[in-house]
């Protein structure tokens, strides 16, 4: 059995005597307040003071209890009745309403309540809260809803739900009713998220929240968490305190939010009360000292006024009301009703006053009549009244001119919060940032862009760095947005000026301006070491296949020239001496032996010529076509030789995304939270899908938390890691020391960076126009040149570019020297062989010459010399062939 916390705030007779003056005309009033209703109790006390009169005083007896506990309610009610109270003010819920109404009807004790109206007729129950059914149905018809979800709290009763379902059956509405009253508090957040995700699958984007403030706030928190508070969603808060909830966090999301308001803050009576209410001490009056008041507290305050007015009217009518001593036992059998309870009930129902909740008047059943409920909508500049509902006029729309979503006139006195991210060269901390304050601490492309945007739009701004250091992505499980997108979605920032990629999923929850920069996903790798030229790099201008063909062509031409010279009679001639005498021999000679043919072809190929030339037409044809061939080959070789010898080349292991996907030696990854990762995750292109499969399953993880971490990983991986990032950032890092990264291949896609604002923000259109104007003025290009190239550290053209023209080094032409040295060495070797061979032959000849039997006296020295010359000449190919 739960123990009742009985507070005898029975303001003691001495204390109340000090407040109201000592008087015997004390009217005992009971009070049943639920735990946690601090503001309602403060409003009750303020009403007691405010409406006190010199004629009589209301003396309260207060009990704090769990209104859902029927036993506790019974015990408290009987305790109040035994004290001799004239009426009881209090709260109930679905579980205790029948207990209270039963006691009131049996004992004739009036019960004044701000709780939800009950169905049917309950004597002695005075309902301070107006019925919302008519206003809600009128609003549904006004918005022309024919399909929606209805979330209700069963603790508030089911009368409103029943009215909606009855109308749905009549008008063929599709209503999905969901009870959220029995959700476990420990798992409420998860349950709410799951609930709205299920509604999303059913395309339910129109929702009625028939709940009290605390539950509405809990639901709204989860709606924001999963991004269901954006354009395309519409919520109706079905209670009388539209402004009671925390609307600021959903104000800029873009969703339509409507509701009802019973307290009109434009009313002079309410304004005067708020002036006094806001000056009360919080310690003495918990929940006070605010510029607003909950509608349940306002109804509590009005209830005190109704009770005061009722007893005043009884005194004016000279109806004596008294309860002397103990009123008796409420559980007596049979029950003994209070004889004067009927008079008090009648007096209460006859009260007609103006209160914080407007005109207060009751019908014969104790229900409010002739009341007016304001219809509210949440705009970007706050809650706004669009009309009202009354029993007579029904719904009347009074707001004919809606505020423009492009209006920025209210920004002059507001400091716009600009969220951004530390990312070079967009936003960087200045070197002396510790000595600076505010926006002066930062520099970069986006810092300059923010200043220009603010200048064109005419607002003050404050730069803030996103807390988690992320751009913005939605968690697959919790559906929570992080990064800068999350700060916009959840109302922590007014605008995001950063390298934020425009994507579909982001566009669903925030608004983007026109792109201020175009880019695409690119590949960053560590710049490979310059390839050292080989010893025979002079052969590189022509492929090895061409060199082989040249060798075969050289041999083939030489052989053909040799054969042609043998068959053509015009290549044969008789040798003559210098004195004109012919040789005595009848044999003819041919200069194009096999060795001379090879020598002629080699001389022509080297463009150096030769001592001999073809005499016949056929030989000259062979020589001509060979000269033409060598002309083209040598010209092509010379043209390429300069580039190959003077340009240093870097051999990249990969050149495209296809190269990455086909290999496993080089790991590759993206930023862990951003549009690049989303691009690969959503891509249906085979190459990119294959890359995503690898990245998702790679161990260790190939994803990095920041771009700086990704660049550092590229630099430290010794060419074993490639980082996929936006091309603009890739180009910028390539310009920064130590100049050891490079962009390879083309862009994988095409996209743009945009300035983001919350859905429906008044800043959206103004920012968009500012971006277009800056683009037309060429300022965006100037800013990029300033931060990318003018401040580059690797020189123009990308620093140590892929190809750099420089002076020739020895390594470039070392092979030529090797061939020269080799040729000289070979020549010396051949000369030595020739010398040895000739010496041996000469020795044999001399030996024969010394033999007396072979001495020919008629031989002269001249004949010996000629023979020696001819023999030596024949070594190089001059031959006598007899045909």
Curated annotation (Swiss-Prot):
Residue numbers on the Cytoplasmic membrane side: 565-591, 611-616, 834-883
Pfam families: ANF_receptor, Lig_chan, Lig_chan-Glu_bd
Glycosites: 256, 370, 406, 413
Record note on what altering residue 875 to Y does: Almost abolishes interaction with IQSEC1. Abolishes activation of ARF6 by IQSEC1
Site (Interaction with the cone snail toxin Con-ikot-ikot): 474, 681, 773
Coiled coil, from the record: none
Modified residues (Phosphoserine): 683, 717, 860, 863, 880
Entry-annotated residues carrying Phosphotyrosine: 876
SUPFAM superfamilies the UniProt entry points to: Periplasmic binding protein-like I, Periplasmic binding protein-like II, Voltage-gated potassium channels
Intrachain disulfide bonds: 78-330, 739-794
PANTHER family named among the record's database cross-references: IONOTROPIC GLUTAMATE RECEPTOR
Protein name (record): Glutamate receptor 2
Species of the source: Rattus norvegicus
Lineage, opening ranks: Eukaryota, Metazoa, Chordata, Craniata, Vertebrata
Protein's gene: Gria2
